[in-house]
C-alpha cells in the first residue's frame, strides 16, 4: 500500500487511440497514464519516460480527457486493446469513469475489443462490453495468498 496517496491529475489528449505495433491489435487504447497498482513485476514501467513525472511508476496517475470520438465507425472490424500499459479498471475508474466513457463512445461502432485488467470493477460494464461483436477480457490474478499479497504491498483482490 502507498505511504501516501498517489498523485492524480487530469490531462487533455488529442486522441485516445495510438496506432500499435503489437501483433494482437491495430490500436492501443489507454484511458490512463500510469497505474496505481504499483506491481513490482510491472512491464509497463517503461512508460514513465513519456511522462513529466519524477515520481516512481505506480505512484502517479494521469487521467486522460479526450474529445468525443467523432467517427467511431472508423474502427469497425479493427482490433482495439484497452489497457496495454495501464489497468483500465483501476480503483480510480470508479470516480473518473474514463473506461466506461470510452466503451459508450465506441458502442455500435463494430470495433473488436480486448480488455486487460485485474479488477472486478469490470463487472460494472459487463452488459456494455457484451454489445461489442467481438470482445475479449483478460483478467489476471497474481496471487490468492493474502500473506504474500500483503508482503508485496499489494491491494486486496476486493
Features from the language model and the residues they span:
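Conserved AdoMet/S-adenosylmethionine-binding subsite of the radical SAM
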Residues: 65-158
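Aromatic- and Gly/Pro-rich donor/ligand-binding loops
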Residues: 36
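The canonical Cys-X-X-Cys-His
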Residues: 39-42
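N-terminal [4Fe-4S]-dependent radical SAM core
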Residues: 1-32, 44-81
Amino acid at each position: 500500500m502507498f505511504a501516501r496517496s498517489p498523485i492524480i491529475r487530469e490531462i487533455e489528449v488529442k486522441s485516445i487511440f495510438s496506432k500499435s505495433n503489437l501483433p494482437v491489435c491495430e490500436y492501443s487504447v489507454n484511458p490512463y497514464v500510469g497505474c496505481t497498482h504499483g506491481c513490482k513485476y510491472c512491464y509497463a514501467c517503461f512508460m514513465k519516460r513519456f511522462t513529466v513525472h519524477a515520481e516512481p511508476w505506480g505512484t502517479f496517475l494521469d487521467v486522460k480527457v479526450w474529445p468525443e470520438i467523432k467517427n467511431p465507425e472508423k474502427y469497425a472490424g479493427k482490433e482495439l486493446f484497452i489497457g496495454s500499459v495501464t489497468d483500465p479498471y483501476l480503483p480510480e475508474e470508479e470516480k473518473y469513469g474514463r473506461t466506461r466513457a470510452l466503451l459508450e463512445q465506441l458502442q455500435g461502432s463494430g470495433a473488436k475489443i480486448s480488455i486487460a485488467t485485474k479488477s472486478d470493477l469490470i463487472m460494472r460494464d459487463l452488459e456494455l462490453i457484451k454489445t461489442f461483436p467481438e470482445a475479449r477480457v483478460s483478467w489476471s490474478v497474481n496471487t490468492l495468498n493474502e500473506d504474500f499479497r500483503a508482503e508485496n504491498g499489494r491491494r486486496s483482490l476486493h
